[in-house]
Amino acid sequence: MQAIVYFITLLLPAFLVAQIDLPPASPDAAWTHQVGFTQIELSYSRPHMRNRKIFGALVPYDVLWRTGAGESTRIKFSEDIVFGGKLVKKGQYGLYSIPGKEEWIIILNQDATLHGDFGYDEKKDVLRVKVKPTNSPTTNESFTIELTDFKPDYSASLEMKWENTSIKVPIMSTADDRIMAQIQENLIVKKVENAGLLNKGAQYYFFNKKDLNQALEWSITSETLSVDNINYSVLTANILERLKRYPEAIESAQKALELARKKDMTDDVKNLEEKIKDLKIKKSK
């Protein structure tokens, strides 16, 4: 008996060591991006094609899908956001979908704790949006979710790609509401005379195609409060150019050019000289 015990004791370490570790078939993935003031966090699993037909086969059409593998896909917004054209409150959600040949349904569900779609309750859906799939020019071996199409208006797209299919859901931050409220309070109601604030307001109106005449007023005032800031004069010139007031735009650009020469800003001098040439051409037409 003692011999048997001794023999088993000798074999036990070998059994404990004898193992083969393989990476998961559907590795985890996670990312965090910022759109406007909103932090977007997403975690999901990335299954692979492995020479299989995906949509309409492995992932059937018109059936709820966990939008990944393993645990349910989770998405979290730090602030309210417009998702697929609909306002969504800040918080964490389960991201589900119903793939279709001609149309997909993208779902945000209150329950982000499920394993896949087991226990999914449609009554907990906070949003359903319909999107059209498009053909991807390249084959995507592994399922991928990423943010794409970032734009200056604080918008982007949540894109899902697998096989030769791409799905995009438009996302837009509510940053504009907050910024416009701050501009309203500080520059319109209180009429704060601060060069930096006035320039920011003018920039925001200019780049987001709002009231250009108001932007011009703020930009000119910022110049009078900070006479040696080249960026303020450049912005004034850009606003005047968009308003097609070319003679005045040339004057503002000339002012910026003089400041650039005075400060030995070689690159700015070159750029402004080119800009003035371009403005003179536009003026002559």
Walk through the language-model features, giving the residues of each:
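Bacterial Sec-dependent N-terminal signal peptides
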Residues: 1-22
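Short N-terminal segments immediately surrounding and downstream of signal-peptide cleavage
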Residues: 20-36
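Extended, well-structured beta-strand/loop surface patches
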Residues: 22, 39-90, 97-189, 193
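Alpha-helical adaptor scaffolds
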Residues: 183-240, 244-248, 258-259
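Boundary/linker segments of alpha-helical solenoid repeat arrays
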Residues: 229-231, 260-272
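Alpha-helical linker/edge segments of TPR/alpha-solenoid repeat scaffolds
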Residues: 242-252, 262, 275-285
